[in-house]
Amino acid sequence: MADLSFNDKMILIQYAIQKYENEAVLIEKLKTVLSEKDAQRGIDTLIGTQRVRRIGPEILENNVSHTELPDLPDHLRPIADNL
């Protein structure tokens, strides 16, 4: 698989959160595309920038009231669909 840019990883994680809100399930699904460290770092970055919020101990949610979900680029669509 081609290397993904930082922004591609953030967008992919946001779309994965839209599909799987449970953090443990989310990380397992993202492991097919990203390392666990990259997935966790991306989640932490998205929480820190308030694009994602934590609802309880295990649930993540896109913070669409704060920022819109970015458009999914065509080259990421097959990856996001296969998660």
Regions found by a protein language model. Name each.
Residues 2-32, 83:
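Short amphipathic alpha-helical interface segments
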Residues 33-48:
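Short amphipathic alpha-helical interaction segments
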Residues 47-58:
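A short, conserved structural fragment
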Residues 58-67:
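Minor-groove-contacting beta-hairpin "wing" of winged helix-turn-helix DNA-binding domains
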Residues 66-83:
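Short, amphipathic alpha-helical interaction segments positioned at domain boundaries
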